[in-house]
Amino acid sequence: LPYPVNCKTECECVMCGLGIICKQCYYQQ
């Protein structure tokens, strides 16, 4: 799935509350 441009990587995008926010990955792919 596409992710917000302010996210460096797809795994940084995390669903939170009403939308998607950027967070660090808790794991490596």
Swiss-Prot record:
Signal peptide positions on this chain: none
Keywords: Disulfide bond, Secreted
Subcellular location: Secreted
PTM description: Contains 3 disulfide bonds.
KW Protein transport (keyword) present: no
Highest taxon of source: Eukaryota
Tissue: Expressed by the venom gland.
CC per GO annotation: extracellular region
Additional free-text comment from the UniProt record: Negative results: does not show any effect on Na(+), Ca(2+) currents, nor on voltage-gated and calcium-activated potassium channels.
Record protein name field: Neurotoxin BmK A3-6
